[in-house]
């Protein structure tokens, strides 16, 4: 049941304040989750305001049914397709703010049946949308050790990636793993050193989840789409939860806030310089949760909020 899983929205006020809400504006919550950000945005909109929410998790779509508000609508799909949803509604260049809350939500982690958690035994699934794509167990069954090791190293920065990958392949050849506890125990046994502050399966579970859901590619596409549809002076507010996510967001905002970089000594006319394009975003800085929020919600500890504004054309 949805109500069994509490979700505390991280950096709630800060992320919504970063959108600089106008009462008659049009906004996108690209990651509805359980609706914390959406409800706060709606509370600041007037009768003419509009909010489009997006989520690829069927449980999030079900949770959105509790919002009976003519200003609100939701799409079941990946946030990477946000520009497509905007084009369908003929709203390109009219979006006043976009909020993205990246990563996995507390209800997804806490529901053992979703297969995201190494702390709770459940099916080895890890899909954000369990109705499409391959599950973690299906991929691990057919993947080569080198491919698994690459995923663990690239997306989890796991120092024992090769050792763990070999152990996974050897185990699956004898007794295929279908449960999260089986994988978590195998990783713990394959890891020669323990960090007393972190479960040995933390990085590997993160890596497999990111790969299964193409999370980093989804972020890159969503950011490009956001830039395409934002109105002049429209805001982009993005919360990330680990360094791989934040690195993508940081580089994107930095790149588009600098404009075209011309090497010194190359002669260009004014027309050529204009054709190369200038700054399209103004980075407005970053925020992290305070001690009080981290004490109340430990999962907020690694979160980073970055805000940018679309430059006038």
UniProtKB/Swiss-Prot annotation:
Binding-site positions, S-adenosyl-L-methionine: 35-37, 55, 79, 101, 108
EC annotation from Swiss-Prot or TrEMBL: 2.1.1.199
Keyword terms: Cytoplasm, Methyltransferase, rRNA processing, S-adenosyl-L-methionine, Transferase
Disulfide cross-links: none
Subcellular location field: Cytoplasm
GO cellular component terms listed in the entry, alphabetical order: cytoplasm
Designated name of the protein: Ribosomal RNA small subunit methyltransferase H
Organism: Serratia proteamaculans (strain 568)
């Amino acid at each position: 049941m949805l109500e069994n899983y509490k979700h505390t929205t991280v950096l709630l006020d800060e992320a919504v304040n970063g959108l600089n809400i106008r009462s008659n504006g049009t906004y996108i919550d690209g990651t509805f989750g359980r609706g914390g950000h959406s409800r706060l945005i709606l509370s600041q909109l007037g009768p003419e305001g509009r909010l489009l929410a997006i989520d690829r998790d069927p449980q999030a779509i079900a949770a959105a049914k509790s919002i009976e508000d003519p200003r609100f609508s939701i799409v079941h799909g990946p946030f990477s397709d946000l520009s497509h949803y905007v084009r369908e509604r003929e709203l390109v260049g009219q979006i006043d703010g976009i909020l993205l809350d990246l990563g996995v939500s507390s209800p997804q982690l806490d529901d053992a049946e979703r297969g995201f958690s190494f702390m709770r035994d459940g099916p080895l699934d890890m899909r954000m949308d369990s109705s499409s794509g391959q599950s973690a167990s299906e991929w691990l069954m057919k993947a080569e050790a080198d491919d698994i090791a690459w995923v663990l190293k690239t997306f989890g920065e796991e120092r024992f990636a090769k050792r763990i990958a070999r152990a996974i392949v050897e185990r699956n050849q004898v007794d295929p793993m279908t449960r999260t506890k089986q994988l978590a125990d195998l990783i713990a046994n394959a890891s020669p050193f323990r960090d007393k502050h972190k479960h040995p399966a933390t990085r590997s579970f993160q890596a497999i989840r990111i790969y299964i859901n193409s999370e980093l590619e989804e972020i890159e596409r969503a950011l490009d789409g956001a830039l395409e549809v934002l109105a002049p002076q429209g805001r982009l507010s993005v919360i990330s939860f680990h360094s791989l996510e934040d690195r993508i967001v940081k580089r994107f905002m930095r790149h588009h806030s600098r404009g075209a970089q011309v090497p010194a000594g190359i002669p260009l006319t004014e027309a050529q310089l204009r054709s190369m394009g200038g700054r399209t975003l103004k980075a407005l800085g970053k925020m992290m949760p305070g001690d009080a929020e981290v004490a109340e919600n430990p999962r907020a500890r690694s979160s980073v909020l970055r805000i940018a504004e679309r430059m006038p054309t």
